[in-house]
A protein has these predicted regions:
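Cytosolic catalytic headpieces and adjacent flexible linkers of membrane translocases
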Residues: 1-167, 171, 185, 199-200, ...
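Residue-level signature of catalytic and energy-coupling elements of molecular machines
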Residues: 28, 38, 59, 82, ...
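Membrane-embedded transport module
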Residues: 115, 120-176, 191, 196-368
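Hydrophobic alpha-helical transmembrane segments in multi-pass integral membrane proteins
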Residues: 326-329, 385-401
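Membrane-interface helix termini and inter-helical loops of multi-pass transporters
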Residues: 335-337, 367-369, 398-406
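Alpha-helical transmembrane segments
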Residues: 354-358, 390, 423-432
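Cytoplasmic-side transmembrane-helix entry/capping segments in multi-pass membrane proteins
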Residues: 370-379
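Membrane-interface capping segments at transmembrane-helix boundaries
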Residues: 429-442
Length: 459
């Protein structure tokens, strides 16, 4: 612009006035407003034949237009939840640096205490403009992304958004990208998870994305992460419970070979446990509500197996071994008094031990009593079904004949509470020792707190 529009006689735009207008625009941008400068050109006959440079010359400045597009009220809490969950949020926008920084402070991505409010200078450490990014080599960009958090990239082109996604992925990070415009499509396609806006998003963005948000709400992504983590945790509970009985089921055959004694269980009795008494309880564990503190845990490593070492050790050496010791101990002590009844007691003790394992498996870290009041109808129905199914197999003569079982003498029933008590005691000691070890490792600096282990999500 060379002049300021003022009726029929435009005023010349000098350097001092230009600086004053720029300061006003910066102050508006510092409030998180998107600022547009409006100008006109007079006497533009034959404009169709002019190029862009000619059209954008000799303009008269009309005024500044500020647009407000405030973030949703839920976004600051969602950003804080991401930080607790170890998810690194990076803002990538086409807005100016001052506007982007102001919005980043409003949503809690940048700390408002790091810069005085209304300061018309974008933080060069946290806010990177497109021109600055273009001057960075790939190595420098990866170093920036690796060692800097809570970054804001302003005035980004589609190519630069794509470059950021590729750089994050080259660091081994799992990258999620949100976008709504055509210029976001390359980054959405290149990300591990592309998330398009369902209400305001373009057809191109929705086609390029993997997920479409129907409510255009960033907080919905955090809820999805929480439910996803809950599903993974429930799979771990399910697997731990299901394989816990394997040790107690294998122990009779090991003892049969080693001690030359009759097997404590028949094949049908093992199937009765695996396909009968364990089925509904396992489904109940799959429906467990999310555990408190789930979003304060670090993200899972990419490619980490669901059936990992901690699950196997806990299932076999803690829960399963406890069941095996009690069930085989009772069988060896009572074998001489009645073979089929001793076998029935072994079966009943494994079922009782699985009831204790069911209570223990509701959490991988909390003592079982801290989850007793958590509502889950399917879980409690499964817990009640175990002794009921076992009693039907033992007390109904046709079923007892098929499964080679007999009713137990009343004095032998005193063995049954020992199995769940042993399992719960062993699991409580195991969880306590793990908590003590982790606290010791964290205090000594050998293990970083979960909040410092970050996975990246690009926005």
């Amino acid at each position: 612009c060379s002049h300021i529009a003022a009726g029929e006689h435009p005023i010349s735009l000098d350097a001092q006035t230009r600086d004053s207008l720029q300061s006003q625009a910066d102050r508006l941008a510092c409030r998180g407003l998107r600022v547009l400068a409006v100008a006109v050109r007079r006497h533009c006959d034959g404009w169709q034949s002019l190029d862009n440079g000619q059209l954008e010359s000799a303009l008269e400045f009309v005024g500044l237009l500020a647009l407000m597009d405030p973030p949703r009220a839920e976004v600051p809490a969602a950003i804080a939840a991401c930080r607790e969950a170890g998810i690194k949020v990076t803002m990538v926008t086409g807005d100016s640096g001052l506007t982007a920084e102001a919005i980043a402070r409003q949503i809690g991505l940048l700390d408002p205490r790091e810069s005085p409010p209304g300061n018309p200078v974008a933080d060069p450490v946290r806010v990177i403009h497109g021109d600055d990014l273009a001057r960075l080599s790939d190595v420098q960009l990866r170093q920036l992304l690796r060692f800097r958090s809570r970054l804001v990239f302003a005035r980004m082109t589609p190519e630069q958004k794509l470059r950021l996604v590729q750089s994050y992925r080259s660091l081994g990070e799992v990258v999620g990208v949100t976008g709504d415009g055509v210029n976001d499509a390359p980054a959405l396609r290149a990300a591990d998870v592309g998330i398009a806006m369902g209400c305001s998003g373009t057809d191109v963005a929705r086609e390029a994305a993997d997920i479409v948000l129907l409510d255009d709400n960033f907080a919905t992504i955090v809820d999805a992460v929480r439910h996803g983590r809950a599903v993974v945790a429930n799979i771990g509970r399910f697997l731990t419970y299901v394989i816990a009985s394997n040790v107690a089921e294998m122990a009779p055959f090991v003892a049969m070979v080693a001690l030359q004694i009759p097997a404590a269980l028949t094949v049908l009795q093992i199937l009765a446990v695996d396909l009968g008494t364990d089925l509904l309880p396992a489904l109940g564990l799959g429906a467990e509500p999310p555990e408190p503190g789930l979003m304060r845990q670090p993200p899972r490593r990419r490619g980490a197996p669901l059936l990992n070492r901690s699950v196997l050790l806990r299932a076999y050496l803690v829960l399963g071994l406890s069941e095996a010791v009690v069930s085989m101990g009772a069988y060896l002590l009572l074998l001489d008094r009645g073979g089929r009844q001793a076998s029935t007691l072994t079966f009943a003790l494994i079922v009782a031990g699985q009831m204790g394992a069911l209570l223990a498996c509701r959490s991988a870290s909390l003592p079982f009593w801290q989850r007793l009041r958590v509502p889950n109808r399917l879980f409690w129905l499964g817990l009640l079904s175990e002794p009921l199914i076992a009693a039907l197999l033992v007390l109904i003569p046709p079923l007892a004949a098929v499964f080679s079982m007999e009713p137990l003498p009343r004095p032998w029933l005193g063995w049954l509470p020992l199995a769940p008590l042993a399992v719960l005691l062993a699991d409580t000691l195991h969880k306590g020792s793990l908590r003590w070890w982790r606290q010791r490792q964290t205090a000594s600096g050998m293990v970083s707190p979960p909040s410092s282990r970050l996975s990246r999500a690009n926005r």
